[in-house]
């Protein structure tokens, strides 16, 4: 393999990784604005642009996962998670816990994700 082919392959691979990392649950909405509407994706309307489907929409994938934690968890400090995570499911906490602090769980599934719900707190 030549060096230029390897560099091109590496560039394409990194581009795919960056697309997956920085994409959001956008549905068919692309990055286009008023001057870029035909080239990105439609922002409002039925979801189809004049040149076909919006080709630059976010990934918006879905998955099923279970997380189980057992044992003693000595945790101190605070954690903050910001951003949009397309998750539909339930949160459950069971068992005895000696804890001080507060927990806030809030979420929303906006109309771009397909279910059109409003935030709940």
Curated annotation (Swiss-Prot):
Keywords: Repeat, Signal. Residues 24-57 are annotated as: Left arm. It holds the Pfam family Chorion_1. GO terms for molecular function: structural constituent of egg chorion. Residues 106-121 are annotated as: Right arm. GO terms for cellular component: egg chorion. InterPro entries: Chorion (IPR002635). Residues 58-105 are annotated as: Central domain. Residues 1-23 form the signal peptide. One of its GO terms (biological process) is chorion-containing eggshell formation. This protein is one of many from the eggshell of the silk moth. Belongs to the chorion protein family. This is Chorion class CA protein ERA.4. It comes from Bombyx mori. The gene is ERA.4.
């Amino acid at each position: 393999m030549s060096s230029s082919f390897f560099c091109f392959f590496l560039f394409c691979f990194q581009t795919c990784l960056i697309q997956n990392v920085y994409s959001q649950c956008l549905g068919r909405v692309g990055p286009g604005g008023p001057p870029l509407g035909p080239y990105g994706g439609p922002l409002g309307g039925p979801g189809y642009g004049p040149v076909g489907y919006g080709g630059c929409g976010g990934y918006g994938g879905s998955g099923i996962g279970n997380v189980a934690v057992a044992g003693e968890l000595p945790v101190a400090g605070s954690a903050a998670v910001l951003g949009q995570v397309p998750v539909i499911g339930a949160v459950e906490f069971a068992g005895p816990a000696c804890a001080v602090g507060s927990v806030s769980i809030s979420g929303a599934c906006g109309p771009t994700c397909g279910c059109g719900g409003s935030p709940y707190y």
